Amino acid sequence: MSGTATNGRRVVVTGIGVVSPLAVGAELTWKRLIEGQSGIGRITHFDPSDLPAQVAGQVPDGPTAEGGLTLSDWVPVKDQKKMDRFIHLGLAAAIQAVEDSGWKPEDEDDRCATGVMIGSGIGGLQTIYDGSLTVSSGKARRLSPFFIPSALINLISGHLSIRYGFKGPNHAVVTACATGVHAIGDASRLIQYGDADVMIAGGAEAAICSLGIAGFCSARALSTASNDDPTKASRPWDKDRDGFIMGEGAGVVVLEELEHAKRRGAKIYGEIGGYGMSGDAHHITAPAEGHEGAFRAMKAALRNSGGLTTADIDYVNAHGTSTMADDLELDAVERFFGEDAKRLVMSSTKSAIGHLLGAAGAVEAIFCLQAIRDGIVPPTLNLDNPARESVIDRVAHVAQQRKIDVALSNSFGFGGTNASIILKRFKD
Amino acid sequence: MSDIADKVKKIVVEHLGVDESKVTPDASFIDDLGADSLDTVELVMAFEEAFSVEIPEDAAEKIATVKDAIDYIEKQKAA
C-alpha cells in the first residue's frame, strides 16, 4: 500500500479555487504572490479612523477577467442579499474549484458520493451587526427572514450543495484560524473512510468590518504601527512586527479518491500526504512556550503520512501571522526538523495577503500545491531584520526556484487548536 | 394602474429579481415568480415598510398573488 494509510484509499486534489486580497482566481493570486506583490491596503469597507488598526487585505472589486470581484458572476443578484459576504467569497472560490476539477455528477450515486465541507472562523459578522441594529432600534419585526441563514457558517456548504446537487456529507468546520486546514484534513478522511468519493473542502472569511477589526484590536492582536505604509504592515519573523493584518477571502479544493480521479482522467495537483491535529490546553489566545502544540500537530501529520520523514519535507508554509508567536512556531519547527531544518525552506504568505483567519489554511494549502507544481517557493515579504536567526531559509523578499516534492502547512487557532497538513507530488 | 399597484410591482421586481413583464396581477409569488416561503415573508415586510401598513400574519398568509397584495394594501389605505 502506498500513499496515505486508511483503508488504502488515497486522496488527491483535482480542483482549486482562491479568492484573496491579491486576486479572485487561484492562478492570478499565485502569479502576483510569487512576483512579490502585496494585497494589503487601507481599509475601505468602512471608515476605520476611530480604530487603532486601519489596514487590511481586502478582496479587490473589478472585472472577473482582471482578477477583481464581480459578485454577479458568482451569485445571482436576487440571492446576494440572502447571504453574508463570507458566503459570497466562499461560493466564488468553491465554484472555481468545482469548474476547475471538471467533476459533474451524472447520476444519483455520483451525487450522493459528493460532499461539501467548507467552514469559516467567524461567519456572518457584518450580518449579525446589522441585524442587532435593526432589533435595538425597536424594529425586531422587520428583521429579515434571511438573517439566520445569512450568518450561519455551514451555509456555504448548503448553498453549494443546492447549486450542484451534491448530496453527500454536508458539513462545516469552525476552528478559528485552523478552519481551512481542518476542513481539508477532515474531508480527506471522509473520503478515506468511504463516506464520499469527492469532497469540496476549504474555508472562507469576511470579517473586515468595524466589529471584527474592533474586536481583534481589543485583543491586541492587530498591527497598528504601519497605518501609513500598509504594504509594510505584515512582516512575519521581523523584529519590527507588531501584530497581524486581517485579510478576507476563501480557499477551496476538490478532494477526490485517487481511483475515482484516474477513471475520469482528472488533472491531479497533488496528494494529501498526511494530516495531524492537536490542542494546546494552555490559553485562549496565546500558544504555550516552545509551541509544543504545533510540534505535536506536525508530528501527528507525519505519523499518518505512510512513511514520510522530516527529511522528505522540502517546504513549510508557516502559520507565521506577524505576531510574537512567529518565533514560537519557529522554535517548534526547528525542534521538529532537527538536522533536517538546515535544508528546509519556510515562508509566510500572510506577509502578502494578511491573515485570512478561517480561510488561511485552505489558501495556504493551495499555495503549497502550486509550489510543488511550479517549483517555486513564495516569499516572506518585509523580513528585513529577523528577530532571531535560524538555520531555516525563510525566503525573505523574493520567491525562490526550488524543486518541492513535499510541503507542510501549519495553522493554529484561538482556543489552542492546531492543525498541520502535508501535500505531496502525486506519484502513481 | 394605481400608484399602489405600480409600487407593489416595483417591490416585487426588486425583491424577486424577475422581469417586470412577468409581474401580472394574477401572477403567484411562489408558482409563477420563483419565490420560496422566506421570500414571501420578506416581500410582506417590504410592503409594510413601503406603505406604512401592518400586515398581520393571518392576512399575510392569504397574499399569494400580486393582485392579493394590491387589494389588501388599497383596502388598508382606504380605511
From Swiss-Prot, chain B:
GO terms for cellular component: cytosol; membrane. The keyword Membrane does not apply. PROSITE patterns: CARRIER, PHOSPHOPANTETHEINE. One of its GO terms (molecular function) is acyl binding. The modification O-(pantetheine 4'-phosphoryl)serine is found at S37. 4'-phosphopantetheine is transferred from CoA to a specific serine of apo-ACP by AcpS. This modification is essential for activity because fatty acids are bound in thioester linkage to the sulfhydryl of the prosthetic group. Keywords: Cytoplasm, Fatty acid biosynthesis, Fatty acid metabolism, Lipid biosynthesis, Lipid metabolism, Phosphopantetheine, Phosphoprotein. Pfam families: PP-binding (PF00550). Residues 2-77 form the Carrier domain. Pathway: Lipid metabolism; fatty acid biosynthesis. GO terms for biological process: lipid A biosynthetic process. It is found in: Cytoplasm. Carrier of the growing fatty acid chain in fatty acid biosynthesis. Belongs to the acyl carrier protein (ACP) family. This is Acyl carrier protein. It comes from Gluconobacter oxydans (strain 621H) (Gluconobacter suboxydans).
